[in-house]
Amino acid sequence: MVSPGQNDLSSDKSQIDPFVKKQNAKLTQVIQNFFSKSVQIVLQSRIQSESHNKEEQLKVGGDVGGHNVSSKINKWFNLHMYNDNLPKEELKLWKNINDVSQMPPMIIEVYLDLRQLTAIQTVILRDDNGNPWTVAKGGSKKHEVVLERWLIEFDANTVSGTIVDELPLIYKQAIILFRSLYGYTRLMPTFKLKKNLNKSNLNIGCKILDGKQPISSKGRIGLSKSIIPHQMLTTESHMSHKHFLPIQTTLGTLKISIAYRNHHEFSIHDNEELLSTHFVNIDDNDKDSEITPVEIEFKEELKIDRDSTTNEKVNEPEDDESHHADVESSQEHLQSEEPDESFEQDAKHISGSRKKFSISNNASMSLSPCSSGPQTVTEDSPSHNKPSANTTPIVSQRPTINPFKVGSISTSPPATTNFGGSSLERKVSITSNKSASNASLAAMLRNPRSSTSSTNTTANIPIANNNSNNQYNSTFPRSVSSSHGSNLAHDNDNLLGFSNPDNTSNTPRFSSSFGSRASRRFSNTSGRQSSLPSGNMNDTSLLATSAGSASSDAPMSGLYIDDDIGDFVRMIDSKSDLRFSGYNSNNDSKISYNQGSNSQIDALNKFQMLKNQHQQLSDSVSASLILHHNQLSGSRPSSRKSSHSIHSPPPSLPSGSYDNSHLPSINSKLRENSSTSGNDDNLARDSGTPSSRKNSFDYSTNSNTTFLKSPITNKLVSSPVTSTTPIHSCLHKTNNESGVISGLATTPSIYNDRRQIHYESVFDDDDDDYANNTADNRDQDDSLKLYLTNKLANAPKSNTNSRSLKSSTNPPNIGEDDDDDDDDLLFTMSDMNLAKH
């Protein structure tokens, strides 16, 4: 008999089983549609046209009108999408399985179809810098390039806790996941490639594969194969991975992940275009930047010599990069993907071409070397670790680009010892700076180690030794040899264009860009270094060590660059300084720095004061011209009396209105016989008036005429000084236009760009004062000109300093308010004209 307790347990079990079965059946249906919905979203964003995508837009609820009634709408997960292009045959494997624990992982591969290429076309891929890299040639064995690999799997080993009513939660999580997937597929590089390939012969295709079956890589370029060399990538890898948030259920976990290429700029080019680009790159960089069909055939011959240990292997399965390794079914699929090695054997010519292409393109990106010969990277270089001489390695790290490389690998001198290699090196940047002065050059050469420590980007130039040939010397740049004044061997002497006349000194010759003046520059301290004997010609370094190196049989016999630098510094220090007039000193005597600087300052001040003599000459010449013009004009007397007196201001602009640098510095001989004190000069500069006012006409000095002491004559002498002021020329320029003088007497270059100002002859104002003395007027004019001539010739001492200072402080009184405004305006205009000059 069955106990009542047993009946209760059996009845509870029978009641639970139908509910669990129903829940599992619904969950299985959700999992099946999860796979089909993922395929539908990926295919729609990759292979369908834009017009079709517009008709099949994302819709949340509702109906789509105007579409074919026969096509069904997939409304799962609130994404209304048509099932027109859904591959039903490929999806049967996941639709017909009732036991979800046996459901295999699904792989969706998105590839670039190359079957439509012609024989004269080549597909290239551009990297982040725009450099083209060859993918495949039309008619080759490679027909596909894998762009993306999607992995949709159900992991039965990872389950969640028992939830009685979990279907609504799972369904809501799936809705969020598919909406994210829908948007992400349109942000990936392959979607951009799809838009760019609308008018080309390239197409994008998709494949749905069983994750448990091995994937053949024959005739394809796998996702794990980088078309762009790793050292040319800006990222760590050529592809990226994305894992979406998994959805956990009581039966297992739903996962979606993707691995895709980062670069999508595929394009088609004709072989003739690539060939022309190839020759252009040879002319520019002496390197190939494009792959040619000839190189492909050459690489096919080289693949026979490849060692099996150097072949690129897929150590890690392609699918292992996109899903977890703990899935048993996924591990079986990943292990089955090792036949990619056959693809490697079939694609050796392309991979080998890409390797060579990467090195050549890397060389083309560096700056042009200084040597005349092209730099080549030989594949049989001892730096390569490959056992085969015809292969080039894949560089694990990006090489450092040295833009100042001199010479090539094949023409470089053989290495000697570490001591020689470290001691016989010299930075080019010491004398390559043309804009640096000799003082800064000497400062750098006095401390060569500290000055050259900052030049990290320049390359070291080794000095040629006994084993160096003429080829290396000829490839040395001409500019370096001329700037360092080096004595090159035989042909380099002809290359420099001059020879050394003698060898009387062991001081090295540093050639100058001034040409023939270099010999005059160093003639006092050093002689020319003659050409060395032919027996010791190869012992001379490229940087031209001292002539004493000719006596040495080896280039490293104790003579270093520092010795030559010290000789050069001593040669510069022994050069005599520039001596000013009055700064008398013997070249052999040692004068302190303070005494020398003070003497130089005094000499410069004395030279600057010579400008004032030029102003005195200008004033005297202007006065003489006006007197001469007055004598010839014979104009009528003016009705207005002149208000100017002997205390009128000098014909100059006010203090501070112009800079002394605008005044011409003409070496005048007016003060050769005069002894003007320095205090008078400083007083004249402080008062704001030129020092030429100190040398105003002295009426108390010796003269051979007696009428100069009369008031009338004094008025005549002072009138020319006031007649050239801007105020007087502006107020009276319309009264008499017969006399024209361009510019002021003190600064004749101020009004060159302005209109010529007509000055009034102010001597007409003074005709009323001595009209009764008409018989003596002509004699007085002649005597006045004689007086001015004597003044210019003798230049006596000036005794009218107080008179000049007084006249500079008392401006002329015009007597009208409007004249004061015009005075300010004219001085302002004068400042503007000075600023322009």
From Swiss-Prot:
Gene3D superfamilies: 6.10.140.1900, HORMA domain. Activates the ATG1 kinase in a nutritional condition dependent manner through the TOR pathway, leading to autophagy. Also involved in cytoplasm to vacuole transport (Cvt) and more specifically in Cvt vesicle formation. Seems to play a role in the switching machinery regulating the conversion between the Cvt pathway and autophagy. Finally, ATG13 is also required for glycogen storage during stationary phase. It comes from Debaryomyces hansenii (strain ATCC 36239 / CBS 767 / BCRC 21394 / JCM 1990 / NBRC 0083 / IGC 2968) (Yeast). Keywords: Autophagy, Cytoplasm, Protein transport, Transport. Residues 302-400, 446-540, 631-704, 793-837 are annotated as: Disordered. GO terms for biological process: mitophagy; piecemeal microautophagy of the nucleus; protein localization to phagophore assembly site; protein transport. Interacts with ATG1 to form the ATG1-ATG13 kinase complex. Residues 358-400, 476-486, 524-538, 658-680, 688-704, 796-812 have a biased composition (Polar residues). Residues 815-825 have a biased composition (Acidic residues). It is found in: Cytoplasm; Preautophagosomal structure. The lineage of its organism: Eukaryota, Fungi, Dikarya, Ascomycota, Saccharomycotina. InterPro entries: ATG13, Atg13_N, HORMA_dom_sf. Its main location: cytoplasm. Belongs to the ATG13 family. Fungi subfamily. It comes from the Eukaryota. GO terms for cellular component: Atg1/ULK1 kinase complex; cytosol; phagophore assembly site. Residues 302-336 have a biased composition (Basic and acidic residues). Residues 450-475, 509-523 have a biased composition (Low complexity). This is Autophagy-related protein 13. It holds the Pfam family ATG13. The gene is ATG13.
